[in-house]
Swiss-Prot record:
The gene is rpl14. Keywords: Chloroplast, Plastid, Ribonucleoprotein, Ribosomal protein, RNA-binding, rRNA-binding. One of its GO terms (molecular function) is structural constituent of ribosome. It comes from Triticum aestivum. It comes from the Eukaryota. This is Large ribosomal subunit protein uL14c. Belongs to the universal ribosomal protein uL14 family.
Length: 123
């Protein structure tokens, strides 16, 4: 569960390394926490030099991994080692060209098929 002030890793090669959530905007209804597949507004806390994204830039991101376990539709419980997000643009397309780490299958049903196709492993 991601809430404002939560630090997240970046799971793509867009140039950012760490994000801090400042607002949950894509959750169902008016919820306080973001789960896998929800869109957040975040600020970049750490970035690589000479990359298009810079530190203290406000961006949108979709949550792809959380430490809080969640239950799949088939009854399997999945929990990841870290909180991670992929940076997206206003249309929902990823800014990076690669995605690192495992991605949840639930993103496919939420119209993030481009992120799922870039992922090396889908759980």
């Amino acid at each position: 569960m991601i809430q404002p002030q939560t630090l997240l890793n970046v799971a793509d090669n867009s140039g950012a390394r760490k994000l801090m959530c400042i607002r949950v905007i894509g959750a169902a209804g008016n919820q306080r926490y973001a789960r896998i597949g929800d869109v957040i507004v975040a600020v970049i806390k750490d970035a690589l030099p000479q990359m298009p994204l810079e530190r203290s830039e406000v961006i949108r991101a979709v949550i792809v991994r959380t430490c809080k376990e969640f239950k799949c539709e088939d009854g399997i419980i999945i929990r990841y080692d870290d909180n991670a997000a992929v940076i997206i643009d206003q249309k929902g397309n990823p800014k990076g060209t690669r995605v690192f780490g495992a991605i949840a299958e639930e993103l496919r049903g939420l119209n993030f098929t481009k992120i799922v196709s870039l992922a090396p492993e889908v759980l």
